[in-house]
């Protein structure tokens, strides 16, 4: 699982190194849409395969799929010449990526956003059961409620990439974060299941813009030879959030109503977007994550 987790940062690094600079937003949006689609379809196909064959066979099929992906990347994906990258790296002064202010903020943002996602995961089945008034078919219903966010993400991710290209990736990030915060808090208001699912779908439309914008800013703020490292750091920050989120959510559920956990998932993003807005570069030149200033 650890080796497989490195596939996504590597794919992002290859994409960022090959796509023209002016199209990076759309590329990141499409990548995020593809990942979201996989997140929606994966559990569906996994469950279907387990029913048709067996759980053990599902692992073999998943491993075979990864092997096919490896072969496709090995033979059909070509990286830029490494010699040019080495010369560029030798010509510039080596700087730790973690010392670059914009990188620090984007890593913080990635970690906190991932924390808010996983914060709700431990309580979601119980909360959905509370909304529908019973625990009947709770696994199936929970899967549907989770999948609506994925569906909206597939629709909206490429559009957010285009918005970032047109108006700037940082403004797109602030807008997506603010929208996700608002809709995340609104999700805690309904007392029945259908309105809750509808608000999750709407929130997914804004959430879809967060990670493409983060990845685009990181791409524009780092030299090509550091793309692999920066996306590895970004993914590591997300995994830290993935560890902390369920612990916080489960701990809160022991003492507070489940609605409080759902509400907090959106509320946490408000101070984050305020902080990012306050710390933003004050000149338009840097709104796209210009590597000239790295602020």
Question: What annotation goes with each model-predicted range?
Answer:
Residues 123-140:
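Short amphipathic helix-loop junctions that connect adjacent transmembrane helices
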Residues 73-86, 278-289:
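Helix-loop junctions on the cytosolic side of multi-pass membrane transporters
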């Amino acid at each position: 699982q650890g080796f497989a987790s490195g596939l996504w940062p590597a794919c992002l690094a290859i994409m960022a190194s090959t796509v023209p600079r002016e199209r990076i937003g759309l590329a990141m949006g499409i990548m995020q849409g593809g990942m979201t689609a996989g997140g929606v379809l994966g559990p569906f196909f996994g469950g279907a395969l387990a029913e048709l064959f067996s759980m053990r066979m599902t692992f073999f099929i998943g491993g075979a799929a990864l092997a096919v992906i490896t072969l496709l990347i090995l033979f059909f994906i070509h990286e830029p010449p490494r010699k040019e990258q080495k010369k560029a790296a030798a010509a510039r002064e080596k700087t730790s990526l973690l010392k670059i202010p914009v990188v620090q903020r984007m890593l913080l943002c990635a970690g906190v956003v991932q924390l808010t996602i996983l914060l709700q995961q431990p309580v979601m089945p119980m909360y959905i059961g509370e909304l529908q008034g019973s625990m009947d078919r709770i696994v199936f219903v929970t899967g549907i409620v989770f999948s609506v966010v994925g569906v909206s993400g597939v629709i909206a991710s490429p559009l957010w990439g285009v918005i970032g290209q047109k108006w700037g990736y940082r403004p797109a990030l602030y807008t997506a974060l603010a929208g996700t915060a608002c809709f995340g808090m609104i999700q805690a208001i309904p007392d029945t299941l259908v309105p809750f699912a509808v608000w999750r779908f709407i929130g997914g439309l804004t959430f879809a813009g967060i990670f493409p914008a983060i990845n685009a800013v990181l791409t524009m703020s780092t030299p090509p030879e550091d793309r692999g490292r920066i996306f590895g750091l970004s993914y590591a920050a997300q995994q830290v959030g993935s560890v902390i989120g369920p612990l916080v959510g489960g701990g809160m559920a022991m003492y507070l109503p489940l609605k409080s956990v759902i509400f907090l998932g959106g509320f946490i993003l408000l101070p984050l977007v305020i902080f990012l807005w306050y710390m933003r570069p004050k000149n338009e030149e840097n709104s796209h994550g210009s590597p000239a200033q790295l602020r």
